[in-house]
Amino acid sequence: MIMEQNIFNAVYKVNHAGGSGSCFYLKNYDLFVTNYHVVDGFREVALQDNDKNRFYARVVLVNPAKDIAFLKAEGDFSALPEIALSALDSVSIGQKINVAGYPFGMPFTVTEGTVSSPRQLINDSYYIQTDAAVNPGNSGGPMFNDRDELVAITASKITDADNMGFGIPVTALRELLEQIGDLDTSVYNVQCNSCDEFISDEEEYCPSCGDKLPSNVFQERSLTDLAVFCEEAIQAMGINPVLARVGYESWVFHKGSSEIRMFVYQRSYLFCTSPINVLPKKNLEPVLTYLLNAEVKPYQLGLDGNQIYLSYRIHISADNL
């Protein structure tokens, strides 16, 4: 199955304080598409391309019933390729598809598979079932056919079941796109699944039809005290902490040319590390001797594989924070 590699440039990673997922760009709408469950509890996220460039994005529309969310990002994406949506009934059993995304938060990958069922009924909704490898982090990414057309949004896999992944058919996305002509992308909107009304003010029931809205759909996840402490420090350096988030109590950002990583280790220590060089291939003894004996307090020099790091460690306690 040969695909136009350029199409994958429109697939991005979604990062926030809860983890990561995948998304893709629809050029005609200037919106990124992902799963609702990928951004559930977050209004602000960071999008990352294959070259690790990051872009601030806001969640502007969610439909929990369809498990679809739209993101509006800051930046110029006009150079990205246009993703075409497949015809309504173009998926059949045995058809080849590609699942693109960032499984487990790893670099971009594409896995090939076939359609096991074009209309698999699960919890009153139809999904495309595939035997392609689908893992956490793939959610929100695209499923393409052999004509580079979008056939589904990768949604999930059955836990502990190999070769069984599911995608939201492109028909659900088409329906949503047809309704967003008057969408206010400056605010967060929830779409009522009963009457399709867009609701931007926090409500328990839809003001148009009275249908009960999903619980917590307007609620944002709170950061831990430690995360607030770290993000205040990141903000003080002139860096948007939203762009630095790469998971729960974990951040990666650049200060000048240096990459800095902040993370919690074994719930006991907060580490700040920066990779500074790699070990030489020969004559290691002088370098290793220096790493063992150099006085760089309060910092430490260390190794991870062949990468030399400069680190700072602090025990997590109320007194230290």
Predicted regions and their residues:
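Short, small/polar residue-rich loop motifs at catalytic or cofactor-binding pockets
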Residues: A17-S20, N135-S139, A161
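Residue-level recognition of beta-strand microenvironments
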Residues: V60-V62, Y102, P118, D146, ...
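Short beta->alpha transition motifs characteristic of CBS
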Residues: N35-D40, T111, P136, A152-D160, ...
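Long, charge-rich boundary regions
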Residues: V217-K282
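Conserved active-site neighborhood of the chymotrypsin/trypsin-like protease fold
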Residues: F8-N9, K13-S20, K27-A100, G105-F108, ...
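Catalytic nucleophile loop of clan PA
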Residues: F24, A133-T154
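Short, internal acidic amphipathic alpha-helical interface segments
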Residues: Y269-R313
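C-terminal cap/linker of serine protease catalytic domains
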Residues: M1-E4, P103, I153-V217
